C-alpha cells in the first residue's frame, strides 16, 4: 500500500530575472500581434545589471518601438529606481532581431499536407518545429492543478500586491516561494509541511521584521488554515539578507522557468519554453491545447489525474503521436479517450489557433504566475466547454 508522501513545487515573482525576460519577450509578442495577427515571432531576452538584450527572429508587416516596450515592461514590474541595479529608464536596451529563416517559413506557411495536394485550409500551417508537448490536470484543487504549485503562485501574487500597493514599503521586486505538501495514501493533500519564501528588501529592515510580516501578511493570508499546523516549517529569507536581487543579483533569460510556467514538476515537460513565441510554434500552442484536453477530460469525470502527450514533425500539420496516461484513475480506457480526443479537438497548428483564438495579444499576462490554472485572468485553454461533447462520445 502507498504511504503518505511529500511533494514540492516552486514559483518566482514577476521581478525574478528569468521572469523579467519572459515578460519582455511576451510584451513584444503582444505588441506585434496587436498590429499584425499573422506575425511570426521568436523573441529571446536576457537581462543583467543595467542591460536588457533582445534577440531572435521576427517576420511581420508591423512596426513596433521595441525599446519603448522593453522599458515600459521593466517599469511595470517595479524596477524604477537606479539603486536596484536595474531600472527601466536608465538600463541599456540592445535589440538584435533577424527575419525568420526562409527554410523554416516554407514548411510552416505550406505544410507537407498542402504540398502533397490536400485542400483542407486547416492543413495549411505546418508545425514550426519538431517536438513533444504535455498537458496535465488533477482534481486535487478547483483549478485542476497540483496544490503545491497553486499555493506557490498565490504566495508570489500576494507579495507582489503588497509591494505594489505599498502595504509593506521595504519590499523589492525579486522573490521566490516553494511549498511542500503532504499527501495521504490515496494521493489527497492533507497538510502543508514546509513553506520557503525569499523576498528582496531594502537594506534598512531587520530580518525579524521581514519574517513576521511575511508569515502573517503573505503565508497565513494565502494558505488555508486547515493546511497549517504546529509541525509546519517556515524558512523566510533563510540566507539572512536579500538586498541585491533582480538582474543585478543574477542574469535572467527567457525560457528558464518552464516548470514554474507549467505543472511544478508534477507532470512531464517536453523541454520547449513558451514566452516570446507566436502560436505557430507548437512548443506553446500544442502545450496549451494539451492542457485544454486534460482539464476537460478530468472535469468530465474520466480520470482523477491525467497527462496527455502530443508530438510533431517540423512542417507537418498533423501530430505524429497522441498518448494518454490516466495514472490508473481512468473510468474509460486510454484508447477510448484518445479516440474521443481525435474527434473533439483539432491538434493541427491552424486547428489549435482557431480553436483557442491564439492570434491575439493575450500572452504577456501569462508570463508570470503560471500559464495554467489561472483564475485571475481569462484564458481560452482553461475553459471547460468541451465536457458535454466528450460525454456525448464517451458516455
UniProtKB/Swiss-Prot annotation:
Keyword set, alphabetical order: ATP-binding, Cytoplasm, Magnesium, Metal-binding, Nucleotide-binding, One-carbon metabolism, Potassium, Transferase
Entry's cofactor comment: Binds 2 divalent ions per subunit.
Enzyme nomenclature, EC number: 2.5.1.6
InterPro entries linked to this entry: ADOMET_SYNTHASE_CS, S-AdoMet_synt_C, S-AdoMet_synt_central, S-AdoMet_synt_N, S-AdoMet_synthetase, S-AdoMet_synthetase_sfam
Cofactor: Mg(2+); K(+)
GO BP: any one term: S-adenosylmethionine biosynthetic process
HAMAP family according to UniProt: S_AdoMet_synth1 (MF_00086)
Binding site for K(+): 44
Ligand binding (L-methionine): 57, 100, 250, 281
NCBIfam families, per database record: metK
Domain of life where this protein originates: Bacteria
Pfam family membership, one: S-AdoMet_synt_N
UniProt name for this protein: S-adenosylmethionine synthase
Principal subcellular localisation of the protein: cytoplasm
Major enzyme class: transferase
The reaction(s) this protein catalyses: L-methionine + ATP + H2O = S-adenosyl-L-methionine + phosphate + diphosphate
Flexible loop: annotated segments: 100-110
Amino acid at each position: 500500500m502507498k504511504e503518505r508522501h511529500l511533494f514540492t513545487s516552486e514559483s518566482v515573482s514577476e521581478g525574478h530575472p528569468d521572469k523579467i525576460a519572459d515578460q519582455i519577450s511576451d510584451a513584444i509578442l503582444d505588441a506585434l500581434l496587436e498590429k499584425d495577427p499573422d506575425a511570426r515571432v521568436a523573441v529571446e531576452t536576457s537581462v543583467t545589471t543595467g542591460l536588457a538584450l533582445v534577440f531572435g527572429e521576427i517576420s511581420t508587416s508591423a512596426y513596433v518601438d521595441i525599446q519603448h516596450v522593453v522599458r515600459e515592461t521593466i517599469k511595470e514590474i517595479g524596477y524604477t529606481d537606479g539603486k536596484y541595479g536595474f531600472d527601466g529608464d536608465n538600463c541599456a536596451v540592445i535589440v538584435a532581431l533577424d527575419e525568420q529563416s526562409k527554410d523554416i517559413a516554407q514548411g510552416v506557411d505550406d505544410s507537407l499536407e498542402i504540398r502533397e495536394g490536400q485542400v483542407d485550409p486547416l492543413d495549411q500551417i505546418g508545425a514550426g518545429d519538431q517536438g513533444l508537448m504535455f498537458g496535465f490536470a488533477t482534481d486535487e484543487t478547483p483549478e485542476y492543478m497540483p496544490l503545491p504549485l497553486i499555493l506557490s503562485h498565490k504566495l508570489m501574487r500576494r507579495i507582489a500586491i503588497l509591494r505594489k500597493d505599498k502595504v509593506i514599503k521595504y519590499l523589492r521586486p525579486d522573490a521566490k516561494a516553494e511549498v511542500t505538501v503532504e499527501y495521504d495514501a490515496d494521493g489527497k493533500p492533507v497538510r502543508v509541511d514546509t513553506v520557503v519564501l525569499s523576498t528582496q528588501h531594502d537594506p534598512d529592515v531587520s530580518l525579524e521584521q521581514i519574517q513576521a510580516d511575511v508569515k502573517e501578511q503573505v503565508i497565513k493570508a494565502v494558505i488555508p488554515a486547515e493546511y497549517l499546523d504546529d509541525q509546519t516549517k517556515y524558512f523566510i529569507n533563510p540566507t539572512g539578507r536579500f538586498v541585491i536581487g533582480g538582474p543585478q543579483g543574477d542574469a535572467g533569460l527567457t525560457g528558464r522557468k518552464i516548470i514554474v510556467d507549467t505543472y511544478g514538476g508534477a507532470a512531464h515537460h517536453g523541454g520547449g519554453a513558451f514566452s516570446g513565441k507566436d502560436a505557430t510554434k507548437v512548443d506553446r500552442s500544442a502545450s496549451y491545447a494539451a492542457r485544454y484536453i486534460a482539464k476537460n477530460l478530468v472535469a468530465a469525470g474520466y480520470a482523477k489525474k491525467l497527462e496527455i502527450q502530443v508530438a510533431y514533425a517540423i512542417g507537418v500539420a498533423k501530430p505524429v503521436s497522441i498518448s494518454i496516461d490516466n495514472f490508473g484513475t481512468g473510468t474509460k480506457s486510454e484508447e477510448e479517450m484518445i479516440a474521443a480526443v481525435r474527434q473533439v479537438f483539432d491538434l493541427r497548428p491552424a486547428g489549435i489557433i482557431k480553436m483557442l483564438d491564439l492570434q491575439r495579444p493575450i500572452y504577456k499576462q501569462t508570463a508570470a504566475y503560471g500559464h495554467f490554472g489561472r483564475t485571475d485572468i481569462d484564458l481560452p485553454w482553461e475553459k471547460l466547454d468541451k465536457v458535454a461533447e466528450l460525454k456525448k462520445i464517451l458516455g
